[in-house]
Every structure is written in C-alpha cells, then in structure tokens.
Amino acid sequence: MVVEGVKTDFGPPYFRDLLHPVIAKNYGKWKYHEVVKPGVIKRVAESGDVIYVVRFGTPRLLSIYTVRELCDIADKYSDGYLRWTSRNNVEFFVTDESKIDDLINEVQERVGFPCGGTWDAVKGEYGLSNIVHTQGWIHCHTPAIDASGIVKAVMDELYEYFTDHKLPAMCRISLACCANMCGAVHASDIAIVGIHRTPPIPNDEAIRKTCEIPSTVAACPTGALKPDMKNKTIKVDVEKCMYCGNCYTMCPGMPLFDPENDGAAIMVGGKLSEARRMPELSKVVVPWVPNEPPRWPTLVKYVKQILEAWAANANKHERLIEWVDRIGWERFFELTGLEFTQHLIDDYRITPYFYSEFRASTQFKW
C-alpha cells in the first residue's frame, strides 16, 4: 500500500551534499597536500583555501554512544563534518589550524582513540594504518577465529607504528576470520586468515528438521557431501572436504566449529598497488596458530616479528614483498625467526594456459 506523502525508500544520499563546504568548493581543484605530523594532513586548493584532515584509529564496531561523542566533537571543531575511511579510521576536517591540538586532546580524553595512521611518501616516512577485517565471532556464522579481538590485540602491540612514522614503506595488515576472505587478505603485506582443520559433523536431527538436503549437497564445491536417503541426513567424505563452511551456510545442522583445531594462518607479501611492479598475492609463512583468546599472544608475537624484521632491514619505499624478493625467502625466515615447514609448500598447480596467457596487470598499451 502506498501512503500519500510518505517516503520510506530514500536510497543513498548524494555524496556532494555531505562534503565539507571547503571540500565542495574546491572539488577537483587541489594544488598539493603535505603531512604536518602523524595523523594530520594539510590540503591546499588552487584558490588558496586550506583544510586539515585529522585522522584517528577506531574499532570497526562502535556503540551509538561513541558515535554521538564523536559527532559532538565534530560540531565543536570541524563544523559538524566527519567521515570514516575504509580502514576504520575517523577523520575530522579543520579549517582553523589552532584547533588541531585541542581536537586531538579531546578525542583522546573523551573516547581514547589515537591520532595517526598516515604516511609521508615524499620523505619516505610511513605510519601503519588501521587493520581492515571481517566480522569474526560477533556476527559471522563460519569464523575460525575472532576478528575484533585479534585486531585489538595486534594494534595494541603495534601502537607506536600507528601514532608515528617509523616504517620504511607502506604496510597494509588485514584479517579474515575464515577462508571465504571477506577481508583483503589475498593481497595485503601481512594478513591473518582463520582456518578450519576438521570437517563438519552432521547433526542428523537438525538436518532433518531445518535443512533442504539437495541444496546443501549442491553447495559443496568439492563434492564432499552425499545424501543419506535411508536416514534422511547427509554424509561427509572427509578426504574431499576443504573446510570452507558452505554447507553450514545452507544448513545449520552442519556445524564446522572446533575449539581445538580452529586457528589462524599468517600470510605475507600481497599488494594491490601497481607502483614499481605488478600486484602480488599473499604467501603463507605461518600455517597455523591456535586460538588463544582474549589476547592471542602467539599470533601477535609472529605479526610483530614480521613487521619489525621488515622495518629494520628494508630500504625506503620497499614494500614487504619487494624486500623479500631482494633478500630471498631463506633470509626472510632467518630474520623473522619463523619456522619453515612442509606445510608452506603448495601442491596446487594452475594450468599452464591460464597461468601464462592471462594478464596480471593493467600496465599495457592498447
């Protein structure tokens, strides 16, 4: 039923209506920008207008009370304008330079968020940005690890790299709570991926009551499921199962969780940028770390070892994979203190046609 004068579907607002007036006025007409200090970026327009972007790291999930606190601060210092980045940083827009320090102090006092997450490529001084990650235990139905808890533990340990410019080049860290990879773990400098190591255990009673068996069987990408028509349930071929969780998505009677065997793998060397060389996919360097909530000490230790070994030995502007290619993987494992095992050797080989013929870069002439 349509009610006269009532509109319920507004859709996304036009983005230009939400821009700070200085940004809207100078849209596409910026002269240059510079990093004043970690977390503060000065942008200068061709018209001479200046605006400062002040960045703070925030959790991915925020309460409405915290959001309201940040909005109150935005009303006070940035004309009521703020935005969140794709890496879960909140940014304020300040036109009066004298307000910057007061803004930073008030955010830290009221909500406790650190200022940082920027870099200065001209000087070759880089800070660590926030971690992009998936839902984890709080919402996702197939996670092998938590997301928010691990990100909090890792960033607490790497806090100094967020608030200062101590790194030689850009470094992106990401996390996905299972191999479905809602996060950008396939192409990040350092990536944490949740992995299941045991197949689902069918709950026959739940399958009979809640599941459509043909759809569940068809959802398996490796053909590891077969219908058990006699008992009206599903059988799992353990040898074919790759622990992806697709069956649990279709059927609540196929739980995949295993507190003892679920854990995380660490990957390194991915990147999306085409600067200097083509994009790269991440490689596994730690095949499995157990779940150790609430602070995941072993996982955090490995991530810090990798980051600090790279930071201490890389050249300026040298991404992690570029550093590895220069020194070699053997030297990488020596410097990071990680153990090389047979689990790191990939037994999958893509077809020669696909591997050799398809482009991996957009850097070509028409």
From Swiss-Prot:
Highest taxon, organism lineage: Archaea
The segment(s) forming the 4Fe-4S ferredoxin-type domain are 232-262
Q: Which residues bind siroheme?
A: C182
Reaction(s) this enzyme catalyzes, per UniProt: [DsrC protein]-trisulfide + NAD(+) + 3 H2O = [DsrC protein]-dithiol + sulfite + NADH + 3 H(+)
**In the record, what terms sit under GO molecular function?**
4 iron, 4 sulfur cluster binding; dissimilatory sulfite reductase (NADH) activity; electron transfer activity; heme binding; metal ion binding; sulfite reductase (ferredoxin) activity; sulfite reductase activity
The subcellular localization recorded is:
Membrane
Q: Which GO terms describe its cellular component?
A: membrane; sulfite reductase complex (NADPH)
Q: Does the keyword 4Fe-4S apply?
A: yes
Give me the segments passing through the membrane: none
Pfam families with a match to the protein in the record? Fer4, NIR_SIR, NIR_SIR_ferr
Cofactor binding annotation: Binds 2 [4Fe-4S] cluster per subunit. Binds 1 siroheme per subunit.
Q: Keywords in UniProt for this one?
A: 4Fe-4S, Heme, Iron, Iron-sulfur, Membrane, Metal-binding, Oxidoreductase
In Gene Ontology terms, what is a biological process of this protein? Answer: sulfate assimilation
Q: What is its EC number?
A: 1.8.1.22
User: Could you tell me what this protein does?
Assistant: Catalyzes the reduction of sulfite to sulfide. This is the terminal oxidation reaction in sulfate respiration.
Could you tell me what this protein is called?
Sulfite reductase, dissimilatory-type subunit beta
